[in-house]
UniProtKB/Swiss-Prot annotation:
Function noted in UniProt: Catalyzes the thiamine diphosphate-dependent decarboxylation of 2-oxoglutarate and the subsequent addition of the resulting succinic semialdehyde-thiamine pyrophosphate anion to isochorismate to yield 2-succinyl-5-enolpyruvyl-6-hydroxy-3-cyclohexene-1-carboxylate (SEPHCHC).
Protein name, as recorded: 2-succinyl-5-enolpyruvyl-6-hydroxy-3-cyclohexene-1-carboxylate synthase
Cofactor or coenzyme needed: Mg(2+); Mn(2+); thiamine diphosphate
Enzyme nomenclature, EC number: 2.2.1.9
GO molecular function: 2-succinyl-5-enolpyruvyl-6-hydroxy-3-cyclohexene-1-carboxylic-acid synthase activity; magnesium ion binding; manganese ion binding; thiamine pyrophosphate binding
Subunit structure: Homodimer.
Note on how the cofactor is bound: Binds 1 thiamine pyrophosphate per subunit.
InterPro entries to which the protein is assigned, alphabetical: DHS-like_NAD/FAD-binding_dom, MenaQ_synth_MenD, MenD_middle, THDP-binding, Thiamin_PyroP_enz_TPP-bd_dom, TPP_enzyme_TPP-bd
Catalysed transformations (reactions): isochorismate + 2-oxoglutarate + H(+) = 5-enolpyruvoyl-6-hydroxy-2-succinyl-cyclohex-3-ene-1-carboxylate + CO2
Length: 564
């Protein structure tokens, strides 16, 4: 048998992608490159995998993040060797904090070409450090290493991912030649060593873990509890909300949950001494999902637990989410499974904290008076649920997500964010991945600095068919720093960095429709009309004064603090 390295490279990649499929991978994100040829060709040849392409590896990583976020499945990412690999790090860091399952398949030069001056060769082993939950550095494909070893080695890292979430890194060094027209059958005896696996269709080496046992309803039904709903799916949020209602407890909904309650606006009313004192009578906090937006809710939670309140945290993610290092009972299991066991019988609700909805209503009333129906960030946040309608919502990491946390009320909206590292990079790409996975219309709310940061990824919307509305709230720089005690003399130059840019020509560059409304009525008509009758992407630019939003927030907080 004549040796053909290109064919052997492809046999390894074919085996790899088939096992990835059996672990649940359905989407593969591919950037251009020559060294990654075996990976790209075999991903393309697999009839049950869907390919997504992008010329920018940083954007590609975030595209995969969005796909994984929305599909709740692992997503594979294929890049060539060199700095292409390094450009995945921002998305990998985000997945390391929020749990999305990325499978990073990085092509590499063989070991003899690393560290010796060869072109496009960097040290790729361990490049993602502890941002991945597991890594595997494969040898160059060869017949002395069995396909059985390849499968059990890949299975090990994928099982670790199945348990803990996050990204895994499989580094794939491919020797040349990379191109060949020879058939794989020249290595048929080698391929046949795993023919039973190929025929049976299951994972080569499987593992099972038992579920933890949650408490019974009898243990908690007489307690004064508070339910906190963080970053979860809409279905999980509804189940958690129903549980809180069944118990008669206050339910505090983070905007990432896509739901609201009679206790909305807590980031504002927690500044009122009377409201805070009433909520502080609780003796049990149950948090579903992670990554809360509200800093004041974090501070209140810390105060309560330090005073002796029990703190339970329900999340399938094994990783710690306990930034104040509090005593915490973490139930590592699916939220639905936990609730199904706990709520297995009727209970008489023990309603308490009955005065708090009054503060919530006052937050909403005063916010509307401050905004005065003008086109401003506070008014958009107040009307966000009606603007999004039945579409999905993606909230960027600007001042606006905090405004939604303060005054917004989302009534059953599938909501997505990147609130792990809370970076302003990759938001266009992540939102595109979410929409590709769900095939639903989407409203994307993003700040101007975030939009500038990921401008390349507007290319992902150029051939969009499903309606998407991208609203850029342009307050000319980082208006969020108006809420922080930064040195006033350096605030503009070193923090806000005003740019003076508009986004009309960015939209034209990528073939997107563009409008710049001047009233709330026009904004509503444009968004609702595009969802009803449009297709493709519409970029809506909303220009607001730089310090308007922070002034509105201060006015609202001052009013609510004074209530008795």
């Amino acid at each position: 048998m004549n040796h053909d390295q290109a064919v052997l490279n492809r046999i390894w990649c074919e085996t790899l992608f088939e096992e990835l499929y059996r672990f649940g991978v359905r989407d593969v994100c591919v950037a251009p490159g020559s060294r990654s040829t075996p990976l790209a060709l075999e991903a393309n040849a697999h009839t049950r995998l869907k390919l997504h392409t992008h010329f920018d590896e940083r954007g590609l990583g975030f595209l995969a993040l969005g796909l994984a976020k929305a599909s709740q499945r692992p997503v594979a990412v294929v890049v060539t060797s060199g700095t292409a690999v390094a450009n995945l790090l921002p998305a990998v860091a985000e997945a390391g904090l929020t749990g999305e399952k990325l499978v990073l398949l990085t092509a590499d030069r063989p070991i003899e070409l690393v560290g010796c001056g060869a072109n496009q060769a960097i040290a790729q082993q361990g490049i993602f450090s502890n941002h991945v939950c597991a890594s595997l550095n494969l040898p160059s494909p060869n017949t002395q290493t069995s396909l059985n070893w390849l499968l059990t080695s890949v299975d090990q890292v994928l099982h670790q991912q199945a348990v803990s979430g996050h990204a895994v890194h499989i580094n794939c060094p491919f020797p040349e030649p990379l191109y060949s027209n020879a058939p794989k059958s020249i290595y048929q005896s080698y391929i046949d060593t795993v023919d039973v696996w190929r025929a049976e269709g299951g994972i080569y080496s499987n593992k099972q873990m038992p579920l933890p046992m949650p408490p019974s309803l009898a243990e908690i039904e007489q307690r004064k509890g508070v339910v906190v709903i963080g970053s979860v799916t809409l279905q999980e949020a509804k189940q958690a909300h129903q549980f809180g209602a069944q118990m008669g407890w206050p339910v505090l909904c983070d905007p990432q949950s896509g739901t609201t309650s009679d206790w909305s606006g807590f980031d504002i009313w927690l500044q009122n001494p009377a409201a805070r004192a009433q909520l502080s009578q609780c003796d049990l906090i149950i948090q579903f999902g992670r990554r809360l937006v509200s800093k004041r809710l974090h501070q209140w939670l810390e105060q309560q637990v330090q005073a002796g309140c029990d703190y339970w945290y329900v999340s399938p993610d094994f990783e710690r989410d306990n930034q104040s290092h509090l005593p915490q009972q973490h139930f590592v299991c699916s939220i639905a499974a936990w609730l199904n066991v706990v709520t297995n019988r009727e209970v008489q609700p023990v309603a308490w904290a009955n005065e708090l909805p009054r503060f919530s209503a006052e937050v909403n009333k005063q916010a509307r008076e401050i905004a005065q129906s003008s086109l401003c960030e506070m008014m958009i946040a107040l009307h966000l649920s009606s603007l999004v309608g039945s579409a999905d919502l993606f909230l960027g990491n600007s001042l606006f997500v905090r405004m939604v946390d303060m005054v917004g009320q989302l009534h059953g909206v599938e909501t997505f964010t990147n609130r792990g590292a809370s970076g302003i990079d990759g938001l266009f790409a992540t939102a595109s991945g979410v929409q590709r996975a769900r095939s639903n219309p989407m409203l994307l709310m993003i700040g101007d600095t975030s939009a500038l940061y990921d401008l390349n990824s507007l290319a992902l919307y150029s051939h969009q068919e499903t309606p998407v509305v991208i609203v850029v709230t342009n307050n000319d720089g980082g208006a969020i720093f108006d809420l922080l005690p930064v040195p006033p003399q350096q605030k503009q130059a070193l923090y806000q960095m005003p740019h003076g840019y508009r986004f009309e020509f960015a939209a034209k560059q990528f073939g997107l429709d563009y409008v710049c409304p001047t009233s709330m009525t026009e904004l509503t008509e444009r968004i609702v009309g595009h969802f009803a009758h449009g297709c493709g992407a519409l970029l809506v630019e909303v220009n607001t004064p730089p310090n308007q939003a922070s002034q509105h927030i201060k006015q609202l907080a001052d009013h609510v603090r004074s209530l008795v």
